[in-house]
Amino acid sequence: MLPPKIFFEKVKEIIWPIERKELKLFIPMALMMLCILFNFGALRSIKDSLVVPSMGAEIISLFKLWLVLPSCVIFTVLYVKLSNKLNFEYIFYIIVGSFLLFFLLFAYIIYPNQDIYHPNDEMINNLIASYPNFKWFIKIGSKWSYALMYIFSELWSAVVINLMFWQFANHIFDTSKAKRFYPVLGMVGNIGLIIAGSVLVFFSSGQEVIDSELLPDSFNSPAGNAIMLQPIMSIIVAAGIIAMLLFRIINRFILTDSINVLDTKKVTVKTKTKLSVIESIKLVIHSKYIGRIALLIICYGLLINIVEGPWKAKIKELHPNTIDYFNFMGRFNIWMGISCVTFMVIGSNILRRLGWLISALLTPIMLSITGLMFFIFIIFIEEIGACFGDFNLLYAAIIVGAIQNILSKSSKYSLFDSTKEMAYIPLSLELRTKGKAAVEVIGTKFGKSLGAFIQSLIFIIIPTATFDSIIIYLLVIFIVMMSLWIWNVIKLNKEYIELCK
């Protein structure tokens, strides 16, 4: 038996592998990630709560394909051009500030006055009756401001988290530090999801924060929803400003060594080349290693998109209005955050003790097990109901889907993100910086958009199709892509080991 002092040191190493001298850098980085992930959790719930109850879960696939993917491509072009003219610090302020400005405009100007900007329901219904195959595009046009909010919310994840924050972290930490820092960073950051969920539940509960005279008739009107939305958006903007201040503090007062200050102009100096947009994309295409990282992201995005659509459709059946949907997503965020923090504690030890390969394989394994459980439950829901007697099958389906979503994303945030980011570290600064920009933004959304293409094509050709009617085809795609993901992880591991030597 170990002496108490050694035992507690071992426990500390497992739960908190950060050394005291590293806290000066770790604490602001962790707080910065907490703010960014708070916004991610809140925005994810807001976009779904606006879109699904008013337009249907099926329309999400069209959003991701026809709106989010082109937006990501445009942003990648702009980012590469900015990276050749400005240093990373200024790019960070410009990008995050632009997001925060839009969120304020949406909450205080666009959303409360949407009746002025959106066409009336009679016109939309007449257009849908005349052009049934364009039903979903007409619906997008009818709620164009919701579409804009959806795009900006999706880009927050791809741009601010995956590109800006992790690129900054990858430059600061080497491989050995990343094994210790990244899981704990994620653990602290995911507390932001719990806080976001709590904020959403508080403001969507109604009676506690809304004048009772507004309830119940006005609470689901744009005016009532705006009363709930505006304070949440104000908190989101405040969190974004805090993240920018922390970024400023890290650059100006903590990273005193000029080598550690990330400056995309230095890429040009070191390599004596200035990449154009086309050259940057070619660099990614011609690098098999970067291609494999992109395939990881594509597989995850496609698979989670295939499972999420049917699940959100079921939530709409149970919670058909914005406020109830919002409240459910807030509670979902709380459980997601708790699960993520728990997985982060486990994941940090798996990564340090079992290595990159096992850690990278656990996410697809977790997703395959929980995803298959969800599909089987939906396909055989009546048979399952007959076996277990009289209970709310719709509620049970939503709970199974929620468990699938929580466990899959928890393993993704704790292990997938950390192993993916570690895969970039052995690369040259040039490939890491500009290659990551293309892979993270385009790769992240291409995976979801590929799943969205399959679904949206069906919904366009067959306007009456629903997720229930195409579920068996989604299951087949799920199994094929899961097999490809596992094979790609094994291949990438061999190349990662070679580069680390």
UniProtKB/Swiss-Prot annotation:
Record Pfam families: TLC
GO terms, molecular function: ATP binding; ATP:ADP antiporter activity
Function, in words: Provides the rickettsial cell with host ATP in exchange for rickettsial ADP. This is an obligate exchange system. This energy acquiring activity is an important component of rickettsial parasitism.
Annotated protein name in UniProt: ADP,ATP carrier protein 3
InterPro entries, per database record: ADP_ATP_car_bac_type (IPR004667)
Keyword entries, A-Z: ATP-binding, Cell membrane, Membrane, Nucleotide-binding, Transmembrane, Transmembrane helix, Transport
Major site of localization recorded for this protein: membrane
Gene name for this UniProt entry: tlcC
Similarity comment: family membership: Belongs to the ADP/ATP translocase tlc family.
Record GO cellular component, one term: plasma membrane
Organism, as annotated: Rickettsia felis (strain ATCC VR-1525 / URRWXCal2) (Rickettsia azadi)
Protein's cellular compartments: Cell membrane
Membrane topology note: Multi-pass membrane protein
TM region positions: 23-43, 59-79, 90-110, 146-166, 183-203, 227-247, 293-313, 326-346, 361-381, 383-403, 446-466, 470-490
